[in-house]
């Protein structure tokens, strides 16, 4: 069963992250392709409504797949976070799906 990886960081400039992404499409695509090689299932960036935080929300086959990807790509990922004004060290959290018989969406 896959896991959700949530990376929630303090960010002073989420729009800066968007700007970096639009100006560095090759870098963003290279990181995405590396993630896919490691098994990435789904990926999104989100900003909090007050603009103070950025969250990366991914689905991976397992925790080890993400950790292997992140070790390999950390030097490419760091400038993306820096562009967003990230001021805290990324601390990923991993979430396992609970069996609750009320699944909806995401291909349930």
What is the role of each PLM region?
Residues 1-75, 83-108:
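Short S/T/G/P-rich N-terminal loop/turn motif that feeds into the first structured element of a domain
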């Amino acid at each position: 069963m896959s896991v959700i990886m949530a990376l929630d960081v303090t960010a002073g400039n989420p729009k800066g992250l968007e700007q970096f992404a639009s100006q560095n499409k090759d870098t963003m695509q290279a990181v995405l392709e590396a993630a896919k090689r490691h098994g990435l299932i789904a990926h999104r960036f989100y900003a909090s409504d007050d603009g103070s935080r950025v969250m990366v929300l991914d689905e991976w086959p397992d925790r080890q797949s993400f950790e292997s990807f992140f070790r390999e790509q950390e030097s490419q990922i760091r400038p993306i976070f820096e562009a967003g004004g990230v001021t805290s060290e990324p601390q990923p959290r991993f979430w396992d799906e609970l069996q609750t018989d009320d699944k909806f969406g995401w291909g349930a």
